[in-house]
Amino acid sequence: GDSFLEKSPSDYITSGDLQEVAKWNSNILMGQALGTYSTTFAMNSGGTGGHDDFGQKSVDIATDLMSGDMVIMSQGYGWFEAAGSLTCTTTTAVNYSYQFWRYYYKLIKATNEILDAAGGDEVTPEGEENQIYYAQAKALRAHSYFNLVNLYARPYAEDKTALAIPVYRTQLTSEAVKKSSVEDVYTLIVKDLTDAIPLLEGFKRPSGAKDQIDQSVAKGILAYVYLTMGDYKNAAKLSQEVIDSKQYTLMNKTEIINSGFASVSIPGWMWAIDLTTSNSPALPTFWGHMDLFTYSYAYAGGEKLIDTELYNSIPASDARKKWFSEYNSKGEQYELTNWWKF
């Protein structure tokens, strides 16, 4: 008899479904790509539901705290405190290992689905628009694997033969794969980005928007990768290409103090999301945790301060020292919080 089980359920879409739809609707890659970018700033993208789980910037805050260059002024709220106390890598009782893993593999799954719909990650699709979203998927997948291999494996320069993380290049199979070596992960990262860069030639984002990856952003990501691999020549070459394109301008010492880095319209910003009340909540955001003038955690005792030794190592002639300098009417310096950086 007939089965009551749906062969193609309507409550989610598979890579196979995307492949079929893409044959007659070229906009499917665009829709999937734009939806994937929203994961980079979505609350609970790491699956914990906490106020320190909101995509890429939550990873950035946690890893800055783990570096020791930034500290939390006082504890009590709980958010980011395991990172601030440097205990998140010594116990499984905190969510960070799960959160970061889940966040990046969620992005990898989404980018793989785009690549599957385009015919696979070894075949460049036809059509300029499809090539753009194919290239963006490759660049975002590379960015995700780059962060994963840095978080969960040995440094490339220290032991590139060490086992690192599982590498998935398609969602057309659910079969689990074994860990790849650090070197193999980096090989895929470099390939994805070098495949993406020429396909993004001439791509212009909608006016005022910087959420999508363009060619300069892809080059910037690859420059970071080369730096981590110790390939300083190629890192410098790519960085110079971005500067020479004049698509983005280097900020002067006045702009870095007065701008507050608060707007995506700042010419120096290459890749950014404009957070608004319509696309993000108030408390669990980058601003809520980092901006002293936002009525949230940073305002109410959870300030993030620069480490004293790092602050003291900044020459007085360096304008960036003013980010962390504020004095009261008696000439006494307040705590080293980021008064004028955001």
Where are these regions (language model features)?
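Membrane-proximal, proline-rich intrinsically disordered regions
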Residues: 1-60, 239, 301, 310, ...
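Short, surface-exposed recognition loops and adjoining beta-strand edges that mediate ligand/DNA contacts
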Residues: 11-17, 56-59, 154-161, 202-284
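Conserved, well-structured interaction surfaces
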Residues: 74-152, 198-202
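Short coil/turn linker motifs that delimit alpha-helical repeat modules in TPR/alpha-solenoid proteins
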Residues: 130, 182, 210-211
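Short coil/linker segments at helix-helix boundaries
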Residues: 151-183, 187
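Hydrophobic-face positions in mid-chain alpha helices that act as interaction patches
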Residues: 236-342
